[in-house]
Amino acid sequence: MHSRILFKGTAAAVAARRIRHILGPLMSKEGWNCSAHEVKLLNTSSGDTVKIGEISYVLKTPKNPELVPVNHMMEALPQMVTQHLRWIMQKDLLGQDVFLIGPPGPLRRSIAMQYLELTKREVEYVALSRDTTETDLKQRREIRSGTAFYIDQCAVRAATEGRILVLEGLEKAERNVLPVLNNLLENREMQLEDGRFLMSAHRYDKLLEEHTKEELDAWKIVRVSEDFRVIALGLPVPRYKGNPLDPPLRSRFQARDIYYLPFKDQLEHLYRIGANVSAERVSQLLSFATTLCSQESASLSLPDFPVDNLPSALTVLNLFPMLSVQQLVQRLYPYEAMLGKEGRTAVEGVLNRFELTDGSTKPSPTAVVNIEPVNGGQAEQAAVTLNITNQKITFQVPSGTRPIRPPNSSPTFINTPTHERLLAEMMQSHLVKDICLIGAKGCGKSVIAREFAEMLGYSIEPVMLYQDMTARDLLQQRYTLPNGDTAWRASPLVTAAQEGKLVLLDGIHRVNLGTLAVLSRLLHDRELDLYDGTRLLRFDRYQALKEELQLTDQQLQDRSIFPIHPSFRIIALAEPPVIGSTTQQWLNPEILTMFLFHTIKPLAKAEETAVLQGMIPNVPGEAVEQLQHLTHSLRKSNDPTALSLASSLSTRQLLRICRRLSQYPQESVAHAVHKACLSRFLPSLARSSLEKSLANCSIEDHPDPASEQKQLYTCTVKDGLLTIGNVSAPVYSPDEKMKVPDVLFYENVQHMMVMQDMLKDFLLGEHLLLVGNQGVGKNKIVDRFLHLMNRPREYLQLHRDTTVQTLTLQPSVRDGIIIYEDSPLVKAVKMGHILVIDEADKAPTNVTCILKALVESGEMILADGRRIVSDALEAAGRPNAIPMHPDFRMIVLANRPGFPFLGNDFFGALGDIFSCHAVDNPKPQAEFAMLKQYGPDVPDAVLQKLVAAFGELRAMADQGTITYPYSTREVVNIVKHLQKFPDEGLANVVRNVFDFDSYNKDMREVLISALHKHGIPIGAKPTSVHLAKELPLPDCKMTGYWTISQGGNTRRKLLCPTETHRIDIKGPVFLRVQSYPSKRHESRSLSFTEEQAHWQIPMNEVNIVCDVTTAKDSIYVATCNPVSLYAMKEKGDSVQCIELYDIFPRTISGVWQPFVSVAALGNPLQDQVVLHEEQGNTVLHLDLVTGAVRRLILSQDKQDEAPRKTSNWWNSKESQPGYKMCKEFAHKNWLLFYKENGNQLDVVDVLEGQVHTIHLPINLKAVFLVAEDRWLLVESKTDRKFLLTKPMHMGAEETGVCQLHAISEDAVSSGFGNNSGMEAVSPQEVSSDQLSNENLSAALGQKIVSPNRILCDTNTYANVIVGFPDLMSPNELYSFRRSLPITESRRPDMFFGSSKRTGPAKRVNCVCLLDANQVVRALPPTQVPLAEVYPKDVTPPMSAAYLEVTDLNSKRLKYIPVPRSNSMSPYTVWISKVSDTDVVMAPLGSGGVVTVDMGGYVRLWETGLDHLQRSLLEWRNMIGSEDGRPVQITIERDSGLDVSSPKHGKIDAKNAPHVGGNQWAGGTGGRDTAGLGGKGGPYRLDAGHKVYQISQAEKDAVPDEVKRAARDMAEQAFKQRLKEIEMSEYDASTYDRFSGAVRRQVQSLRIILDSLQAKGKERQWLRNQALGELDDAKIIDGLTGEKSIYKRRGELEPELGSPQQKPKRLRVLADVSGSMYRFNGVDGRLERSMEAVCMVMEALESYEHKFKYDITGHSGDGFDIELVRCDKVPKNNKERLKVLKTMHAHSQFCMSGDYTLEGTEHAIRELAHEEADEHFVIVLSDANLERYGISPDRFARVLTSNPQVNAFAIFIGSLGDQADRLQKTLPAGRSFVAMDTKEIPQILQQIFTSTMLSSA
């Protein structure tokens, strides 16, 4: 088992080795030179001789005996070691240099030292690291009293003095450093920097024969001693990490494999140590260790077991024989923390094999019971008593120099059983070795280490490690003395070693292993050689040396030899290695040998609660409970997303949350969690996962408090007290006023909330971290915050090249002395200022992590040897300590993590030591208010548009549709521009922001569509005004009179009795008011038309719109299948909907189709409407705010009527009479109801709650409320008209009687009273108010003042009745006649042929706009003179209707087409009953109408002329008045200059036009003389002629033939490309259908992949270069004149032996089952899946090295249908189309059935076997899981069955809420439901961006 060697030697060598092992002890001496050798020391006259076996070596007396290693020999030398020593002696006698190679551990060094001790040789030891340079080996310059001179370094010293040079860690040194030694090794020659030349002893002695020593000295030749040898120690590199040996270097060494000691020797050694432990356990332990070091375990990539640490483990076991071996193994080899699943199973298997799994049965120590100091002896010791299974065992451990503190006496440390046990275990390890604590960030490593130190009376020396730390930073740094001499300063680590402190190496996982290697000798042997030649020895060796040489301490110190204090110990703190990642495997075999490891497990729930409540006694208990529930549910999850969230909720973060809740108990826990996780900037998956976890733990997410407490967010400074919102703090009075920032800041609610939050945390003493997109005002908020608090600030901006040095001190050279200037950080710490660190994410996280020590412990070591300490008392006694000012705080600003900022993940690395605040763009209202302050003169409409458009763009950026997050900064810049140059158009100014994207086609499309949607006419020209064509209106003629009868006898007859009773109200019932977002599009984005805006109501396709009405700025739409009401604001962005199908059942015994009218009530009943169902005469009153529905029952006698016979109003031949509602005066809260052919009117006063019923002597056809007290009635059958006058107030007069007057109509020709008059026509619409006098005069073409009404009927465009209804004299009727009357029937229907309907449509669609003097009707295209509207060769557009606008002011007629709806209800006949056209219409404001078509599309139109003119002006302003004049550059000169060349020119007396000619004044288009439109003239001079000007458009235009040529060229290339891939044009267009649909997602994915690739290729600093930028760390070396003191950026080659970057592995599992094909017609699911597959193929094209993907299908035929193989991905469009065709064909012809579950299981299983960086499975399925009897939790189990494989499922939504239910049961962030199949590509993009790319 031990014969495995680490080189692939020849088979023969292996065999020989094995046989030697087996036969070694039996063979005779000469057989193998391997018999038992002995080491003898012989004293002879010629000096002492050492004999090993038969080889002897004569000792020489060392010149410097203190440099000879002492105390290294083992008591009993194992045979193996003796053989190694004998071999080294052979090589030494031959004068060869040796290389001891072998696995990591101290054995090789120990053998070398033993040999040197044996042969009494002086040693020069160098630990090579990646920072070693040539100067460390040869010569270093130092400055003494102003001159630089050279000091020999180890190699030169060893060569000249005849010492042995021990080089350890050859694989660590950078390439090309060691070849410096090549010549010294080979020929023992070397040229030195100071001009001397080392020459081998042999040659030197030859020269001496010819020359004198003086001559050689003059030639600067130095003799190399013949005793000089090199012993190199190194690791074999292909197996371990490091640089391989240079072949020329390798050839100069003789190698010897130093493997672990043989089993037998090792066993004997362990038996001696662990006398109390049963022999069997010792041998099992050793067998276990040896197994893990074997070649086989290396192939499993398990790191080697640190065999060399077994003795220390046995020391512990010897004291505590009852301990569990398995737990000890964990300390030596923490396999659970560092290995993946396979590795863990392998290790546990071996443990079982050797019966070592006794972790559960054997006890572990439970607590430290007592600690007391032990007196006597030189070293401080403490007796520690541990409690283990109720036995108390006491043992002695080293202790510190401070007084010992008994356990459990610390006020700040809350003890929990876990921690007590951990401390007890650490005591055991402390007995033998240094400790390393492994635990996640924020779990209390530092706290435990400090508690441990205090218990043992240690002083702590924290050493913060960072990534680009060098070996010098760890051990010794150079500095200059005041006189300019260079000197070395020991690092804190070294001083701590001498003083016996406890060093905390914080962040050992960050530092480079090549640097850490310099500590291995300190950790293993407690010895250290420093750069200036100082040596530190282990205490016992130092004592031995002192006694042997009889020297005093002082003498030894003069020879720079110092002891290491026996109490000195190191505790390393590290985060666990990331299992499976390639980067962070810091726990390698080398480090395993250095420490004993203790992992800190996350606390159990009860213990953590105890800690939280112990630390913060007054925190609300319920909050803690909720937090704990959430945190532990996240930690227990095996979902990587959940675990990453859990890491944000570390114990430290929980303590912070609790501290805050204890101060502000009214805050919600959800808010705190969102803040801690920074949920605003999480990828969408993680955010949904977090929200789901919060919901599962029933943590309520309270609504945004901003809406509730608007009035609270103000800030005031009063009597030295600052109040923000409801938090107050005293204002600071600083010494330095000038450093307090003062900034232009406009307050808004949202920023005040952030500041209030910041103030809360600030008062709690937290350091703050503000994270947000660019330009959201982080800097402004902070400056404003500090301004309000009156705190001075120091400002530090980080960038890519920030180093730890620049963060703390800036070195500079002055007069040859290095001066350190304090950075803002140090100043802020000293003075108590606030340090603002900007752009923190730009600096590498390894740099910024030094802030951690500063925040956490308030300690930090500066480059010049000073240190910051938190405790002022501690600083008092120490000269170089800077006490941290109590007022010092840090505020860090960073951009949001992740794409597109590409910063470093500052939040991920350091987020939990700051209190985090997400800063977002202000909410629309807040942003609007703020912009208003920046641009007070910019019109509100423009600001609203900007705010809305940018709001939408930001939402898109959050979803990942666009990559750049547009911020407030951009909008503010636009507004500032508009404020200063108001004439520039908005459309032009926004280009300042969007021109960045003008070359990216997809991006440009998205932007333009978003801007157009909000009415920013980017791209429109001032000429694109497309208003409808105007036609002349026929002349206005007086056509007749209306006379109101006054006859006395008829008057009595026509009195109408009225009665009044209360309304019977049933209800209310409360229905849900649902709010849907409306995608409101401004229509005037590219051209100016009458249409203002349009949007779609979210209604079902089969629903039918049957009425629309408006009130102020609200629009109400009623639909009748099912009955629902939609309400929206004219400018709003949401639609409220109440569905009333519970109240109107679909049928009452038959096919009953409801038909609804709606009336909007006025003040004080705003937002309330009355719905009237015309058949059942149901009247409902709805409150749209509360959702209350009440039924108003009008007549008492109607209720007991028998149910009517069933009918449906669109089938019966005889139209069933319906009930009608007149709503002209609904805004006054009264309505009138009547029944067709009935003879009574019901007047409902909604406010009073009364009904007045009026009985009439006639049967009604129609009622028009022409005034509040005068109503026009039309009699049915005869169409005769009557005027009903009523007293103004019902019931005010006793009579309460209404009078009815008949109206006679007369034609113009005959005289009065002649009843032969005109035939009676029923009017369609009569206005309820009169035209203003100007409008009336304009309409009739004569000045006139009179009451009037507009009346519309089918024969005329409009009629004006002058004098009606107030004057009793005959009223004149003026008409604008039509040539053809409007017919009332629709054309035969396209689908259903000519289903004739009887009677007119229900909706007349005629509106009178009195202010605009217009009548607007909606007409079907058949009724429109299209030939006159459109030119001959233009085909009229397909339209739903035309709006006919009759303008009585301009006497013009316009026809405006209303675009067709996208979707049409199948119930065409029913629709034809509603309206003659496909729209219904209502007036909107005073100059416009709103139309709603049958597809539910709402359009707003502006028809009034003055409205249109005003809008056109605004629109032109928005485009900007680029009037085509060339821009002139004018330089105004002072008059003193000679202006001769431009002249005024001659004045022509005749003033004839002159064009050009450089002669006449007042010309046009010339040069040099004054005139218009020319160039170079002195000024403009207009002589009144037409200006000849080339139009700007013409100048800019590209000639047509050029355009044509370009188009042909593109087409040619396209065809050529198709030909190459043999694709037909039809195929190309088919493929384009799929690829075009996902082009945008593909684009954005590729952008992200590219940038990731770029980020991965980011260059690193290469140090020790001969050119580049000066490296701060090397300034002193620069002073002394060294060459390689520069650093430059370069590609860092990956270290050899570091694992290869493997590609990520993706499998897409597409559903190609029959149902996909079957339901494709419904929602296009198959096509969407094909698009998704197309997207994967296109996005990952040419990234095959990073993503290996394949695509398989699952259907009823099986679960593994191959579509794309990962080794044969489609290369071009043809191959991709083939894949898509296969999918389509398969789903068309496959069996039914569902294999989603099996397919997913199979894919996950198969992928897990493959080698990859990460594994992803994405399942697309329309699985109706319940139908196939699959329970969702089974599916959930499959998705998470293998933690290595990230599986996601996208369900194509199916019936009802099934998909949502499914999503609730499946793990969060793992399953998506695409109810709308268009979302599939977006979801896929989300998955890609948030997971694959998080770690790429």
Swiss-Prot record:
Pfam families in alphabetical order: AAA_5
Keywords (A to Z) from UniProt: ATP-binding, Mitochondrion, Nucleotide-binding, Transit peptide
Organism of origin: Danio rerio
Function of the protein: Exhibits ATPase activity in vitro.
Official protein name in the record: von Willebrand factor A domain-containing protein 8
Residue ranges occupied by any VWFA domain in the UniProt entry: 1705-1887
This protein's record includes keyword Secreted: no
Gene3D superfamilies named among the record's database cross-references: P-loop containing nucleotide triphosphate hydrolases (3.40.50.300)
GO terms assigned for molecular function: ATP binding; ATP hydrolysis activity
Positions contributing to ATP binding: G439, A440, K441, G442, C443, G444, K445, S446
Record carries keyword Kinase: no
InterPro entries the UniProt entry points to: AAA+_ATPase, ATPase_dyneun-rel_AAA, P-loop_NTPase, VWA8, VWF_A, vWFA_dom_sf
Chain segments carrying region Disordered: 1536-1564
GO biological process terms, semicolon-separated: notochord development
Name of the gene: vwa8
